[in-house]
Amino acid sequence: MNKKIIISSFASLLFLSQAANAEIKIGKGSLTFNAGVNSQYIFRGIDQNKDAASPFVGADFSHPVGDFNLYLGAWTGAQDNVTGAGGQEIDYYAGVTKSFGPATFDIGYIIMTYPGAITKDIKEVSEYYGKLTIAPDKQPYTLGLAYYVDDTGGYKNSTTDIAGNYYEFNATYNFGPVQGLVSYGVWENETKTTTVSISKEIIGVGFTLSYISADKDGSLSSLYKDKEYVTLSAKKVF
């Protein structure tokens, strides 16, 4: 990976951390922006940027609607794992959240696009998703699960459709100095991924160090062998 790019990106984030919070109020809603860099962009156990650093930027809007909270967002980052993608991924998503005591439900839809992809079936991948997070009051932990349903028929490996639905179980724990996360996810016909992370905010920038273990889920997986990664990411919300 290009260490100069990583160091430069982290330095830029530290500079941004000195900026005032730029949250924009729009009626009862709010608009925020984020920027960051991943030392490697790993998505469900698969390297998305050929072992290179992946800078990213995004924007999120949220607004209360009755008893629900509506959110809309867009994100783009460096990506070089889709033929002809041109080094970029652009995602759009929308959903609603609702809390009942310690339980928060999140239902939404995400569209992941690769503008330069050479064939239609890999230009866009869309998914419905549902998430549940349990955060008991005054407790240092949360428990969560998520389920993503493919809405574009996956993509083809030779003549066979692969990459179906995805489900994940996760838990977080607040250790005080750092936050911990453990997750296990299965991407049907692709990967089974275990992630262990610790996170820490330093002068307004959130840093996350992760160990990721990805196993092939069948012979058609685009992961040619089981893989392990250690990644560092930094993200600033402003």
Model-predicted segments: where are they?
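Outer-membrane beta-barrel proteins
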Residues: 2-9, 13-238
